[in-house]
Design a protein with these regions (language model features):
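Short, basic-rich loop-to-helix N-cap that marks the start of a DNA-contacting helix
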Residues: 39-52
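Short, charged recognition helix plus adjacent turn
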Residues: 2, 10-11, 15, 35, ...
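Short basic helix-loop element that most often maps to the first helix and adjoining turn
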Residues: 6-25
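Conserved hydrophobic/aromatic packing and binding residues within compact polymer-binding modules
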Residues: 22, 33, 61
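Recognition helix of helix-turn-helix/homeodomain-like DNA-binding domains
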Residues: 28-42
């Protein structure tokens, strides 16, 4: 299974919030946001900070998706 942060990006769009604002409010780095943009894993501490800043549960910012391998 792979991680997807598409829910987070949609939430930011719905709230008309820029990534820079999230970085400031959650106290996370631009590097972390870049990793999330590539659907790479980040620590639960980071996810907790984002959830706290947005006042949402973790399921509202990420999901696990099937990891398809090409043959």
């Amino acid at each position: 299974m792979a991680v997807s942060y598409n829910k987070l990006w949609k939430l930011l769009i719905d709230r008309k919030m820029k990534k820079k604002e999230l970085i400031e409010q959650a106290g996370i780095s631009r590097t972390t946001i870049a990793k999330m943009g590539r659907d790479e894993n980040v620590s639960t501490n980071v996810l907790s900070k984002i959830c706290g800043a947005l006042n949402v549960d973790i399921g509202e910012i990420m999901e696990m998706v099937p990891d398809y391998e090409e043959n």
